[in-house]
Amino acid sequence: MKQINLITMAMICCMATASAQDSRQSSSIYLSPTTPGATLVPFALNSEGIKLPIRWGLDVAWDSEQNVRKGINHIGKDNISIMRSSFQTTYPLINDEELTASQKQKLDTRTKLIDIVGKDIDIVLNEDQEAGIVSYYVENGVANVDHWCKLINASVKWLNENYPKHKVVAISPYNEPDYSWGQGNLASFKEIAKKLKTEYPLFENIAITGGNTLNNDEALKWYNGLKPYVDWGNTHQLDGSFTNYANFFKTVANDGNYPYADELHNVGEAMIGAEYGIKMGIWWGFDSRSRGEFCRISNSGSRIGYAENRNAWTAASVYRDDTTNEIKAFIGSSERQANTSEFNFISKDRMVYFDGYGPTHEYTMSIPGGTDYQKGQTNAEKVIDVTWGEDVQPSIIKGRYRLMNKASKNVAAEYNSDNIAMVKAAKFNSTQLWDINPIDDRIGGDYSYHEITSANDGRHINVQNFSTYVGGNVMAYDGKNSSNEQWYLKYAGNGYYYLINRESNLYLMAASSSTTIGINVQQGALDTSTQAKKDLRLWKLVPEDAECETKAPAIPSGLNAKASNAAVRLEWNANTEADLAGYIVIRGDADGTNWNTIARKITEPCFIDNTCEQGKEYQYAVKAIDKSDNISRKSEIIYAMPTGDKGLIANWQFEESLADNTDNAMDAVSLNKAGFVSEHKSGEKALYLNNNYLQLPYTIANSDEITIALWTKWTNTSSGWQRLFDFGNGTDQYIFL
């Protein structure tokens, strides 16, 4: 049986609330207190999860080829099985039965866009009400049901005759009828649905969708009013409450009908829809990575975490790809109604890295909102890579770098005015130096990207003319951080990255592996068919003060371990390279599985692992890393485990320090700067907590038995439920005082 004793002495507490302070090299250096009040998103990597597959599609009612190609590049054709097109009420029918040339041309243009995705993709038709509604269809606010039905029938018939491989599976006779488009009332909508169902054989197997409202608060009224002729329940989320949005899809599902969202604007809407039952989602204007990653992983994986903040109109989720085992965390909002909020993602079963930040069990992400409806709104959304293993991103990317291509070892630089080309690396040449920073979370839409700005003149690495095609030219330009100037840095291993453009979802690459000066930089699809082709797309982000070279440091030697009752101290011989940046410590289970990086770029040849479990044996190894992010092979493996002996696990005296006085180095950190006062019970000082709190190491209470002793002077009487300590792993495992 594991037993620990914690002694915490001489605290003066007002209101419990810990600034991280300097600490020795133990696991505690990675502790990062989180701001209270964030919505918790707990997840377990190995949990069974929930499968929530959704049919995904794109919209050509807004007939933009750029929108379609962006969607294809981000989602992938294999994940697109439905498209939304439109019929037009802009012209009367010829002889009450035939479409005009203009109506046919518009259908043809839109269907050709659908053909880019696939020539046999299913189609939903809605009304293109924004193009106009002539009096042939609505006069004095009264819809002509016969004319409306004949138009829809003629449109479907024309598609069947001219594009027979496509199948029209559903019709939305009115689009956003709750808005002032002038389509007609609910009664006329129902009459149109009834007439199509009962008098037009063509519609025997074509679904009718409703309510199709702009405001999801109105959706249930328009949906219920169409019964029994409605098959799919549909709403937009351009206004309305979170609760009504969720309840609408629940109601449709409970009716045995098909929950459907034909105009998604944010991954938040999609996540919430998935929670409450949608089976199909169509993206209106397609943005980028968050939506594409969500479409892919929702159909190839399982959801292992979900949380929502209804007051802020935001939500978050975590998905696992069951084929690749990749983990993605998502955060999203209402396009027009969100308030700024925070989500705290908590990995319950192992320490991980969130977009390179870690190792940690928790990570807090803020998502920006506005002050009111369409005031200060950014339609914010983000996807976060959750990773682990013995080869993780070496550090957080933020600073000035050279971009060295793996194939040629040359670097990307401004070249001949506007071009970006491969040149020999040279110090003190600002044309080949790039400032790489995360984009502002208020940039608009997906903020999962970095900006790459020339240190020479402030221009950005820009995909020319917003190209979505393979071979698109890359240039230096200042488009004010437009979408074709934003890049996803995807870690590829061994210190290299893929750089993927937000607009095109294509990869930055050298056109050739030649070392000749002036080889063009362009974008291309991922190609890993040969190592040579893969290398053209791999980049090392070499810090400004480092050399562009690929020689790895020597393998660390002399690794040994000394166990204490709740930790393992590792020591090894120091490397002697002049450009050494530090060491990487990796740990695996005794059977050689579950390797993870437990320390990165630590500068001294020693480390105390206090995240290990008592009674469990581990393998340890160390790598060296230089300033150019060249990484050595791992050292010889050693085996070690905590002794598990009974006795003192942690002891904090708080003498101007939050350090633990035992060999376990269970150092604490504080949310805000820790204060120390002379009033004390023992020693010389006491810790003063006022609107502050300490975060202790995660394994501090991981024992079958625990004894806690502390001196506390409580000076606050105005607030209830103040805690002296609070340990927990969800609502079913906790202890507090």
What are these regions (language model features)?
Residues 609-630:
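Beta-strand-rich modules
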Residues 566-580:
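Conserved aromatic anchor
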Residues 542-547, 639-692:
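Extracytoplasmic low-complexity segments
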Residues 40-44, 58-220:
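Substrate-binding cleft and catalytic face of glycoside hydrolase catalytic domains
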Residues 391-551, 665, 669:
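Lectin-like carbohydrate-binding module/patch detector with strong preference for beta-trefoil
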Residues 625-644:
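Extracellular fibronectin type III
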Residues 153, 157-169, 180-401, 407-408:
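Substrate-binding and catalytic surfaces of secreted/luminal carbohydrate-active proteins
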Residues 469-470, 645-649, 658-662, 689-737:
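Extracellular glycan-recognition modules
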